[in-house]
Amino acid sequence: MEIDNKSRIHWACRRGMRELDIAIMPFFEHDYDTLNDSDKRAFVRLLQSDDPDLFNWLMNHGEPKDGELKRMISLIQTRNKDRGPVAM
């Protein structure tokens, strides 16, 4: 998936697990455009992860072995915390 194909990335953000949608969609909608290309690639790679892995990582029940993905999880958590709850 290309980092500038926002419609495909948006679709990939919709996971089918409400908890993941609540974590990933606001980050994509509010923060994706501010990321540099390297971070955009890491985010797209993160979206290729399995839902159970994403859920566990975002809920702090483990972490990715890949350093870039680990940093992206941390960035998502930080930005979402700083932004606060959003209406879905």
Swiss-Prot record:
Name of the featured protein: FAD assembly factor SdhE
Main location group: cytoplasm
Pfam families for the chain: Sdh5 (PF03937)
The encoding gene: sdhE
Subcellular location: Cytoplasm
Annotated organism of origin: Pectobacterium atrosepticum (strain SCRI 1043 / ATCC BAA-672)
A GO CC term assigned to this protein in UniProt: cytoplasm
Record keywords, A-Z: Chaperone, Cytoplasm
Role: An FAD assembly protein, which accelerates covalent attachment of the cofactor into other proteins. Plays an essential role in the assembly of succinate dehydrogenase (SDH, respiratory complex II), an enzyme complex that is a component of both the tricarboxylic acid cycle and the electron transport chain, and which couples the oxidation of succinate to fumarate with the reduction of ubiquinone (coenzyme Q) to ubiquinol. Required for flavinylation (covalent attachment of FAD) of the flavoprotein subunit SdhA of SDH and other flavinylated proteins as well.
Signal peptide per UniProt: none
Keyword Chaperone in annotation: yes
Keyword Kinase in record: no
Domain of life assignment: Bacteria
Summary of subunit composition and partner proteins: Monomer.
InterPro entries in UniProt: SDH, SDH_sf, SdhE_FAD_assembly_factor
Similarity comment: Belongs to the SdhE FAD assembly factor family.
Gene Ontology BP, a term: succinate metabolic process
